[in-house]
A protein has these predicted regions:
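Glycan-recognition surfaces
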Residues: 422, 427-461, 505-613
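Aromatic-lined carbohydrate-binding/catalytic grooves of carbohydrate-active enzymes
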Residues: 328-465, 478
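Extended acidic/polar, glycine-enriched regions
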Residues: 168, 174-177, 257, 268-319
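C-terminal beta-sandwich/jelly-roll accessory domains of carbohydrate-active enzymes
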Residues: 680-792
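Short Pro-Gly-centered flexible turn/kink motifs
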Residues: 95, 104-109, 286-305, 781-790
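Carbohydrate-binding surface patches
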Residues: 236-237, 245, 650-696
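Conserved, mostly hydrophobic/aromatic
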Residues: 15, 167, 291, 337, ...
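Polysaccharide-binding surfaces and accessory modules of carbohydrate-active proteins
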Residues: 7-14, 18, 28-266, 282, ...
């Protein structure tokens, strides 16, 4: 709900209130964002009067922007938007260079409008409201130094406690203005210190959560690689310094954008904090001619007094209901097998069909043909852009392979990388000017490839035509849309010299145009985004593709950390995760198959290994995993995902190397608990599993996934039980292991949701080096457990 009264504005969600007002000089002052304040239109002005600081005397060395407020310095107040040149020395929201070369911005309030529905920026993806219950507020400001207007557009999504924001510049004059910065959101707060959370990394090391206390100076989270990047995800959280997972004031913002971005947290000199998020100004400028409009990307922000978990719940709801769209929004996603780690580039139809038949027998539903099927593609040095079938590998082409896979009862998926071109390709030889490179200068290659210039209409048309042909002739059910290099040599041969600073943003606009057209043309295809893993895992891509490959690192222990960090702002229904072979191809780590499954099950499950080479025992395990996942798929994909005691704040110092999750069905009738161990500790026998999110007034049947263990796990300790001596790893040891398995522990209790959530229940005793009994839990390094809860 939006309330406006004279010069005061309130954005009300179910549990939060956002207040700001116009001052006597026309500046917009931010007053409050936090827990809900009950107020109506008649109370709004008096509440704003109470919250507005009374300034009688200016601070030393302050600059006074307007004689109407002779004591007010803009550097010492909380503002809705900021610019340079009038006394606010902090990072600005907007920066313009006018025709005379001046840079001072002085935007003052002009008018407001309340609009039914949610607004989105032109040419960019944005949040939507399928129920059409949202409202938007548009505030118009005018620059006193030019004829430029600035529109601030707020959207209120009451049920998920989220507010969307973006800005629009309109040049109402005749002279061209250069835009050097236009952010998407600003939040000024009277806070002396904040705990900043950002998520950084690199290829195969995405989403490392970094927590920093900021008391002075600036904290910057940004990327200049051309895309949202694995180096700095646009998800950005800040909280009071005492905030925990479940308690305390916590805020978050995320950007609905896939290009270069920057998030600032700045501690000013007067006990105030400023948060900014938007396009990275270091890689951006825009010529705004008379009559033209420029829109910044949309951002979302949220607040919860229930700590990081509260913010996560709200962002998960926002992504599921207001970002992901189309046929697959609420539809259960199929279990897939991907050919990449099984074959890499060495794809042949016979090998593919052999793998597909084995996969179909296990219950896998979708076969994905990864890289290597097109042009003359035998390695990563050629053929990107040449999207015709390699008939040496696929004698009957995609159409023939697809038909055979469909006859097996499987869906057919294909890997493509449409934004790229190889120097050794027919496309590049015909259109060298379509590549992003500076003519006559040495080019920086990545993975032996270049980026196609999506700022050009003819390039976008080529991608649309070639991909439409691939999807149609292949009768494709699923597309993995990859992008495997960062931008370099920013330059378009189609742009004039004065507009080269627009290239990076224009590229993203071109990409969105392509994605919109294809997803509208092929609404039944399940699209999965990928960018060497998580190099473009963002809300912008999720507006077109309902799931994204989270990381090229398929190691279960690495993935547990990566997926745990994604959970701060993204639900598991958008995270693609695979069970791969061991030793893992990225880390060479060996982890048990049940652990690999447990981690990958919290997301969109796939397998990425050569099932034709899997042992009989492992094949039985995989069949059991797939049956289990299908039974619990709706919970695992669309349930509420809770982190259980993520940090050491509620764990023993001996128990911090454990990841715990709980996924609860929307109606709280079912839940899945997961515990993933790191390295095993000696003499640590007892653990408790405590849940979150259950119905306190109901009883649940709590039980675990039963396990049986190979006796090799006990080594020569088998001789403490065997009637004859058995040499470790001998033929006799191997023969015994074929017939005898050790039963794992069994958990089987009826317990209330209140006890599970508030107390937790003790689990079976771990093996601790002092003896083995019938119900002892045998934990080795990197083991995992899955627990199930059903209302009774």
């Amino acid at each position: 709900m939006i309330i406006a009264n004279n010069d005061c504005f309130a954005l009300q969600t179910a549990h939060t209130t956002y207040l700001f007002r116009k001052d006597a000089a026309g500046n917009l002052l931010h007053l409050y964002y936090g827990e809900s304040i009950e107020l109506d239109e008649g109370q709004l002005a008096s509440v704003c009067d109470l919250l507005q600081p009374v300034i009688k005397n200016p601070n030393g060395c302050s600059l006074i922007a307007d004689t109407a407020l002779p004591a007010q310095c803009l550097d010492d107040v909380c503002l809705e938007i900021s610019s340079r040149g009038k006394g606010d020395m902090r990072e600005p929201f907007v920066e313009l260079v006018l025709a005379d070369g001046s840079r001072t911005g002085d935007f003052r309030y002009e008018s407001f409008e309340i609009i039914d529905g949610l607004q989105s920026p032109d040419g960019l993806p944005g949040a939507y409201d399928a129920e059409n219950q949202a409202q938007s507020l548009m505030i118009t400001l005018t620059d006193r130094n030019s004829e430029v207007k600035l529109e601030l557009i707020y959207g209120v999504l009451e049920e998920c406690d989220c507010i969307t924001r973006y800005a629009r510049l309109i040049n109402g004059g005749e002279e061209t203005v250069r835009v050097e910065r236009l952010m998407s959101m600003q939040l000024d707060m009277s806070k002396g210190a904040l705990k900043i959370n950002d998520f950084h990394g690199d290829w195969a090391r995405e989403m490392n959560r970094n927590e920093t206390i900021l008391r002075s100076g600036k904290y910057i989270n940004d990327t200049g690689v051309g895309f949202s990047s694995n180096r700095a995800n646009p998800l950005f959280l800040w909280a009071d310094t005492e905030t925990t997972q479940d308690y305390g004031d916590c805020y978050a913002t995320n950007l609905i954008y896939s290009g270069n971005h920057r998030e600032y947290a700045e501690a000013g000199g007067h006990g105030k904090m400023r948060i900014l998020s938007g396009i990275n100004p270091d890689f951006f400028e825009w010529e705004l001619a008379g009559g033209e409009v420029f829109c910044a990307p949309q951002a979302v922000m949220t607040y919860s007094h229930r700590g990081y978990q509260g913010v996560s719940r709200q962002l998960h709801h926002f992504v599921r209901e207001h970002i992901v769209r189309g046929e697959w929004k609420h539809k259960e996603r199929p279990i897939l097998i991907n050919s990449w780690e099984a074959m890499y580039f060495d794809v042949q139809e016979k090998k593919l069909l052999r793998l597909a038949k084995v996969a179909a027998e296990t219950g896998i539903e979708l076969f994905v043909l990864d890289d290597g099927w097109f042009g003359k593609r035998n390695n990563d040095a050629s053929s990107l852009g040449d999207w015709y079938d390699n008939k040496e590998k696929l004698p009957e082409g995609l159409a023939g392979l697809s038909q055979k896979l469909h006859k097996l009862g499987m869906k057919f998926g294909i890997w493509v990388e449409p934004e790229m071109v190889s120097e050794d390709s027919d496309l590049y030889r015909e259109h060298p000017d379509w590549a992003v490179r500076i003519p006559g200068k040495e080019h920086a290659f990545g993975r032996n490839q270049m980026i196609l210039d999506l700022t050009r209409q003819e390039v976008r048309e080529y991608i649309l035509e070639s991909m439409s042909d691939v999807f149609t002739r292949g009768q494709v059910d699923y597309v993995k849309w990859d992008m495997n290099r960062n931008m370099s040599d920013y330059y378009s041969q189609a742009l004039p010299t004065s507009r080269q600073g627009e290239f990076a943003h224009r590229y993203i606009l071109g990409l969105y145009q392509v994605l919109y057209t294809l997803t509208e043309k092929f609404p039944h295809i399940l699209f999965e985004g990928c960018a060497s893993g998580g190099n473009r895992f963002d809300l912008g891509m999720l507006c077109y593709m309902p799931q994204i490959w989270a990381s090229d690192n398929t190691d279960a222990i690495s993935r547990a950390s990566i997926q745990n960090s994604y959970s701060y702002g993204y639900p598991q229904s958008v995270i693609a995760a695979h069970v791969s072979g061991c030793p893992n191809h990225q880390t060479l780590r060996i982890t048990p198959l049940p652990t690999r499954f447990a981690v990958a099950s919290v997301g969109i499950l796939g397998y990425e290994c050569n099932l034709c080479d899997v042992s009989r025992e492992d094949m039985e395990e995989i069949r059991a995993e797939i049956l289990l996942y299908k039974e619990w798929r709706s919970v695992l994909q669309f349930g509420e995902w809770y982190r259980l005691y993520e940090s050491s704040e509620k764990q023993s110092v001996y128990d911090t190397d454990v990841t715990r999750w709980n996924i609860v069905s929307p109606d709280k009738s079912k839940a899945v608990g997961i515990m993933i161990k790191g390295q095993t500790l000696a003499n640590y026998a007892y653990r408790t599993f405590r849940t979150k999110g259950l119905d306190a007034g109901s009883n649940y049947h709590f039980y675990n996934r039963s396990m049986r263990y190979d006796i090799h796990r006990m080594g020569d300790l088998i001789n403490t039980m065997a009637p004859v001596h058995v040499k470790q790893d001998s033929l006799l040891h191997g023969a015994i292991s074929k017939f005898i398995r050790l039963d794992g522990e069994k958990e089987d209790k009826i317990v209330s949701g209140a006890i599970l959530d508030q107390c937790g229940i003790p689990l079976a005793q771990n093996y601790a080096g002092t003896g083995y009994e019938q119900n002892t839990a045998l934990y080795q390094d990197y083991d995992a457990r899955m627990y199930f809860m059903e209302k009774v």
